[in-house]
Amino acid sequence: MKFNKIKSYAKINLSLSVNGKLKSGYHKIESLVSFVNYYDEILIKKIKNKNHKIQFIGKFSKGINKNNTVSKLLDILDQKKMLNNQKYLIKVIKNIPQKSGLGGGSINASAIIKFFLSKKVFNCSKNNLKNLTKKI
């Protein structure tokens, strides 16, 4: 099977307001963002395997550990049985630097969710989607 190729665009915060802390330890924020023509490329295909395979390659892939947003997303989707036991090979070609404030990791997870929704891998209401993304 051929890879599906998607782009995961970087975002720039035009306005950012920190409004306290959440129980998770993360900050509660309100932000106005704009997307720019700078992106990671993500290759996705179904595999016949027991587990998902996730690979990060490219100049900004060094140091990405197993506790990344793509792995977290797939773990949550598996736990909720939203992927119907289907496994995927996902290759992320990192062009967006880590921890640069450009949203690389979270934007990657978001692009994968958008891809799965467009391919009707699962259906999800806006409310359920909001709850899902809070866990990543």
What are the functions of these language-model segments?
Residues 88-101:
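Short pre-catalytic strand/loop immediately N-terminal to key active-site residues, enriched for Gly-Thr
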Residues 22, 27, 101-107:
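Gly/Ser/Thr-rich beta-alpha loop segments that engage phosphate groups in nucleotides
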Residues 1-57:
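N-terminal, positively charged, Ser/Thr/Ala/Gly-biased leader segments
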Residues 70:
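Globin-like tetrapyrrole-binding proteins
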Residues 73-77:
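Thiotemplate assembly-line natural product biosynthesis machinery
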Residues 40, 128-136:
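FabD-like malonyl-/acyl-CoA
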Residues 62-63:
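Start-of-domain marker
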Residues 102-129:
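DPxDG-like acidic metal-binding loop motif
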